[in-house]
Curated annotation (Swiss-Prot):
Catalytic residues identified in the record: 205
Top-rank EC class of the record's enzyme: transferase
Species whose genome carries this gene: Photobacterium profundum (strain SS9)
Residues reported to bind a purine D-ribonucleoside: 5, 180-182, 204-205
Gene label: deoD1
Protein name (Swiss-Prot/TrEMBL): Purine nucleoside phosphorylase DeoD-type 1
Length: 241
C-alpha cells in the first residue's frame, strides 16, 4: 500500500534497496546495471526502480539530501514495504591526508552532529554502525575486483556549508575517512526497525586541500562503487543460503 512519500505497492520493492541521494542517479543505476527494470514510485520525482542483477531482484531509489529526507524514505521502505537491507551509495568529502580523490570509502560507523539518533535513543548517544556482514561482503567484493577501499568512521553532517572550517581538522585528527550527510540517519533507522544498512561512498572532493574531481572522474569511480555494492548483495545471499 502506498505511503505519503512512496506510491508503490507491497511486493514492488526487493528486500535489498540501493539508495543514492539523487533520483536521477537512481535512474542511471537502474538503466546501467539492472535488467527487466520497472519504475515503482515517483512521488516528488523521487524515482524508485526494481530490476534484476545477475538474476537477483534488487531495487534502487533516491533518498534526497540530508538525514531528515533519507530517514523518511528508509523508514517507509522498511516498515511499509518489507525492505531488509539498505545500501547507501553516494559521494563524500575527504579530510585525511591518506584519503585521495576517487577513493571508495566504506562507512563502518557514522559520527554526526545531528540529534536524530539521540531522539530515537532516549536522549543518549547511539553508536550508528553498519551491519558487519554487509561491511565484510563489500570488502570482499572490492578485493575480488581489485578495487582498493578505505574502511572506517565517516561523519554525517547537518550542514553542507559548515562555517566552522576548523572542525574539519578535528575530524582529520579523529580519523574520519569521509564526510557526507546521511549515513548516521540510515543506520539509526535500520537499528530502530530491525533492518541492516551500509554506506559506500566515492570521494568527490578533499575538503582541507581544496581538490575536486571532474564529472567524468566521478562517473568512473561511481561505477566501481556500484559494482562493489551489487556484488556484495550476491555475497550476502551466499552467506545466508
Amino acid at each position: 500500500m502506498a505511503t505519503p512519500h512512496i506510491n508503490a505497492e507491497m511486493g514492488d520493492f526487493a528486500d535489498v534497496v540501493l539508495m543514492p541521494g539523487d533520483p536521477l542517479r537512481a535512474k542511471y543505476i537502474a538503466e546501467t546495471f539492472l535488467q527487466d527494470v520497472k519504475e515503482v514510485c515517483n512521488v516528488r520525482s523521487m524515482f524508485g526502480y526494481t530490476g534484476t542483477y545477475k538474476g537477483r531482484k534488487i531495487s534502487v531509489m533516491g533518498h534526497g539530501m540530508g538525514i531528515p529526507s533519507c530517514s523518511i524514505y528508509a523508514t517507509e521502505l522498511i516498515k511499509d514495504f518489507g525492505v531488509k537491507k539498505i545500501i547507501r551509495v553516494g559521494s563524500c568529502g575527504a579530510v585525511r591526508d591518506d584519503v585521495k580523490l576517487r577513493d571508495v570509502v566504506i562507512g563502518m560507523g557514522a559520527s554526526t552532529d545531528s540529534k536524530v539518533n539521540r531522539i530515537r535513543f532516549g536522549g543518549h548517544d547511539f553508536a550508528a554502525i553498519a551491519d558487519f556482514g554487509m561491511v565484510q561482503n563489500a570488502v570482499d567484493a572490492a578485493k575480488a575486483k581489485g578495487i582498493p577501499v578505505k574502511v572506517g568512521n565517516i561523519f554525517s553532517a547537518d550542514l553542507f556549508y559548515n562555517p566552522d572550517f576548523e572542525f574539519f581538522k578535528t575530524m582529520d585528527k579523529y580519523g574520519i575517512v569521509g564526510v557526507e550527510m546521511e549515513a548516521a540517519g540510515i543506520y539509526g533507522v535500520a537499528a530502530e526497525f530491525g533492518a541492516k544498512a551500509l554506506t559506500i561512498c566515492t570521494v568527490s572532493d578533499h575538503i582541507l586541500r581544496g581538490e575536486a574531481t571532474t564529472s567524468e572522474e566521478r562517473q568512473l569511480t561511481f561505477n566501481e562503487m556500484m559494482e562493489i555494492a551489487l556484488e556484495s548483495v550476491l555475497l550476502g545471499d551466499a552467506d545466508e543460503a
